Amino acid sequence: MTWERGFQRCWRVAIAMAALHGSASAQEPAPIDAARSAFLKGDYAASLAAAQKATPDDEDFPEFIALEIRTLVETGKYQEAVERVGELGRRAAFYPELALEAGRALRAAGHRDVASDLIERAVRFEAPRPAKDKSRATVAFGELLLEHRVDAKVVLDRLLEPAKKADPEGRAPYLALGKLALANHDRQLAAEYFREGLKRFPGDPDFNLGLEQSGLDLPAANREPGIASYLDLALKANPKHTAALLFKATELTGRKAFKEAKDVFEQVLAINPDHPEAWAGLAAIALVQDDEKEATAAIARAKKLHEDNPRVPEIIGTTLAGQYRFAEGIKYLEEARQLDPLSPPILFELGSNQLRFGQLDHGWENVALAHELDPYNVAAFNLITLRDKLRDYPVREKDGVRLRMSPEDMAVFGGRALELAARAKTTLADKYGIRLSVPVMVEILPKQEDFAIRTFGLPGGESFLGVCFGPLITMTSPRGRLGRSNWEAVLWHEMAHTITLDASRHRIPRWLSEGISVFEEREVHAGWGQGMTSEFRKRFLDGEVPPISRLDESFAGEDIMLGYYHSSLVAEYIVRTFGMEAMRAILADLSTGKPVDEAIAKHTKTANLEKDFLEYAKKIANSYGPDLDWTPLEDEEYVAYREDPAKWVAANPKRYAATMMLVSALTEERKWQDSKDLLEKIIAAEPNNRESFNPYMSLALACRGLGDEAGERAALLKLLSIDSNVSDAAARLLELGGTMSAAERAAHGDQMLQTNPFQEKAYRTLAAAAKESGDPRRTREALESLLALEPRDAGRLHYELATLLRKSDPVPARRQVLQALEENPRFQAALELLSTFPPAPPNK
């Protein structure tokens, strides 16, 4: 009997045996299942031994050979795997699972053409019909087609979904469907498949890894010491799970935990000493750390088996881009594209990073090609859809800044945004001594979803207001966040990132970049950026803050807000103590690859930076309400307070929490004078109070209740000088009457527009103040913004603008008076004004 005939006979026997001995199988796993189980647990020696022990008489012989080849590849025995494939000859293409593993082994060893030939021969066979006893074969055939770059939807509809339906308790369909969804950036769909698989195969490391890659958090009920994520569960089930270890190392690299990432990559190399992806990951870390010698050696090891392996430059490029080293990352991704010009993942990664780095034409071209080759890639589809929308968005330029906004937003506050962006760029570039070589593109997108897709490729990122990649800044329009944040402060913050990224050649650690940006916010306006609070005060005084060397870790956990403030204090300390020259020199050293701790030590000339900085920070913390007791009430204290709040506060006048609770009660009872008396005492103890339950807003309410308009205005102004995000305070200032100068009224209008640039009253206030001050340019800007909001008195405003422009700009003036008459054809004053213009020239 020939080998292949025996092979086919055994395949038929396997089906018959499964039918005849189903009950026995439930009691004792088949040998192939036991061997696969050993592989899943990371017992590769047992898996290999079982596979190599099999003979052609075994019912699952083809699957044993497939497992043997897979185990050899997993453990780095590439040459043995290739030799085993060579022994099979053309027979390797007869069975889908065997052909799949054989092709992957050949490709891993650098035999790409041979692998392609094998897969091409394998897919010529008829696809196994979806059936309970053939789900693995059906899925493997589908994966062969995907590797052959057959339309993913065809594979999904004709093989993978039918395989799942025919074998709902089978493992392979759920795993393949989840991986396909992940490849298409559809993490929600992927999670559904992996979750279904995990229900049927509890503890399976592949499904746990899939859920981690889908972005799911492990439910609290499933957590235990040492197990905080699905990734932890995967590695608990199989500590040698190469894919899980690579994912963990990549995540650690993204968080700049390079030492820990290296350790995990070394774990992979202990399993497979020649694993190209592990060596590529180590090469990327070396490049990020500017260790050219180590990077060169790691790249050589990564290419040891396969000089033209596109995954090596793809991994390096993706990692570098993830560290904001876009220029270098794009270079490696272009190398990957040259090695595999039709790879949708490579094209998409390259294109999306080119878009982030301001290389818009090339970026859109590569994303479009990725979408054309793989129309089911959700991220590519999202970007192409957004591109079509962005084409209709106008772009305005000034002083090296290009601003793109929706037509509606551009008409209302585009001029204001462009003016601010240009001023921020010029001011900060001069301050940090740099000259940008390319324009800065600022894109303010009207919908949060559009912002997320432009920035991350996928919806989400609700906590982000803006993101800077260097020459590109993306922001959400305040249209969707009215009154919830100061968009002007956000824009200034992001422009500071542009400057420090350029000054350091994108080598600045996140904590220092964020610290400088928050510090620069406060330099513009004390109410921008962050300041000391009772919570931050306690953390600094109790020593519950990380050392400067570990500040980056603050941005990956619950302490992110403290991380921003802490980092900004370090930046402030360096500038205040050693001058801007020191900060510029630190950034210059970073640009050469010098580690940040060495750069700071070199230019601060202090024996103990950490100690000196903490003294500086603690001095600021101690000065924040030093005579107040900021601690919340204990249970026993709260019980005593509830018995007689006024008496308890009188006996404990320094307890901030109790005082503010009493103020809240007095406000509800409209006991304005009692409330005001308490508030004035608490404010005197800390005039720059930044607590979330702020006494200045309560004081303004009390003054309003007492008819004290001057007191109310003073409280609101003080509050906004401390925290410019309080839009309610800005709105109330606009409502207040009284005698104010044009400059004061304009300041109130400007304050309102920082959080809500769509506020009609603010533009009316600015227009009136500018007119009174004799400033026609600002009058025109305010009136044009107001008209873009389509107010009810548009006719009168068009007339007012026409009157303003009549002598200086008669053509737009005539257009404005005509628009006034469109609103009201009987507008007598507009008719009279129109008569003063010469007739319009006839259309040519």
Tell me what each language-model feature is:
Residues 30-31, 36, 210, 274, ...:
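Beta/coil-rich, acidic/histidine-enriched accessory regions frequently appended to metallopeptidases
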Residues 42-46, 75-84, 111-118, 148-159, ...:
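Structural signature of tandem alpha-helical TPR/SEL1-like repeats
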Residues 36, 70, 104, 143, ...:
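Residue-level recognition of tetratricopeptide repeat
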Residues 57, 91, 125-129, 165-166, ...:
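Structural marker of alpha-solenoid helical repeat scaffolds
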Residues 28, 62-63, 96-97, 130-131, ...:
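Helix-start (N-cap) detector for alpha-helical repeat units in TPR-like alpha-solenoids
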Residues 83-84, 229, 236, 263, ...:
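Juxtacatalytic substrate-recognition/specificity segment
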Residues 53-54, 87-88, 122, 162-163, ...:
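Canonical positions in the second alpha-helix
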